[in-house]
Amino acid sequence: MSWEIEYKKKLRTPQEALRSVQSGMRVYIQPGCAEPETLVEALMERGPDVEDVEIVHMMTMGTAPYVAPEMEGHFRHNAVFIGGNVRDAINDGRADYTPIYLSEIEQLFTSGAMPLDVALLQLSPPDAHGFCSFGVGVDTSLTAAQCARYVVAQINDQMPRTYGDSFIHVSKIDAVVESSRPLCTTKKAEITELHTAIARNVAGLIEDGAVLQTGIGGIPDAVLPFLMDRKDLGVHSELVSDGAIPLIEAGVINGARKNFKPRKVIVGFIIGSKKIFDFVDNNPIFEFHPTSYTNDPLLIARNDNMVAINSALQIDLTGQVCSDSIGNQFYSGIGGQVDFLRGASHAKGGKPIIAISSTAKSGTISRIVPMLSPGAGVVTSRGLVRYVVTEFGVAYLHGKSIRERAKALIDVSHPKFRDELYEYCEKTKWLQRPAAQVVPMR
């Protein structure tokens, strides 16, 4: 049977395709900008007819209707990375959060620890050989499709065709739903003067020939424009967004000096606007892989001069990093931070960087704290942290004692909080305030 005939036989309406979801099943939804919204809408229509269906995904960009209070009992959401659309539901106890390294999520599927009944995907139309592309979202979805008992694909002619390990054949799909609609997009973060100040300090650590990993948000977006005078940069990252386009077009990012996968932008998924979607479409400089590959610390470490730039919510004076919760309120997830910091720390000339603003809540609280807030989780241990960058400078912690770490972190904290940080250090006998900063007794 030709793939064309097989494809036509598998065509279904969204409602027909989602009848595959039965009570008690576990359903995977392709995350990020590749979220199959037509299938999600049909899944919600199915909701009143099913009970105890677990929905698993990394981070979706849609409205997440499955966590609405009226869906309780029908759907239970389990996020391996928390987005703003499910944060309240998780902290209200109506949904779950599974903390895990991004590099290890696929192991849950392949090992049977988290068996998948149904995978809901969004793919490009098949090519002349019957292969559909995962487009902007290979991430954990290729492996999910390989492990799920039933695969439903939303075929969208607006999904880019991307290169790399990013294809699935029509024969591996059980139901096809054709739906042409724009992909989910994200707005570019507003770059503030604060972001620019932090970015300037980060950029000072990036040399010609460096290989970059950056996330999304104001700080990463602010770093990239500072690199327009660099030469032969490369990219090995879990994600890429719009900010990389000018550097690629200018030839700054060309991968010429990469010793691992030279001349290729290695990426797991794309987050951004239609501009970046169009840019990656049939663009051979991009090579997409599952995040078990992009985030493998051993592979990351093969990149000489690997620079990993990640952020955090809090850092204590010993160097412990919290990046997934605010106290006991879960905020995001572990994601790829540890994967890339570990990989960069083992790379020749590597630089693992935590870049944060020194304060939060309009400058009313310090992000550099004596102790992490009660209930906060340590995502990155003090032994792994090397560079901490704020708008006030760079603290280098690797190989430093607790006394030296505390001093370095206080030096890059906001000046208005330094006295109380020193007071804590004096009470714990970690560190004495420098003579010039001793507060005279009254």
Q: Where would I find each of the regions flagged by the language model?
A:
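Conserved alpha/beta enzyme-core scaffold
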Residues: M1-R442
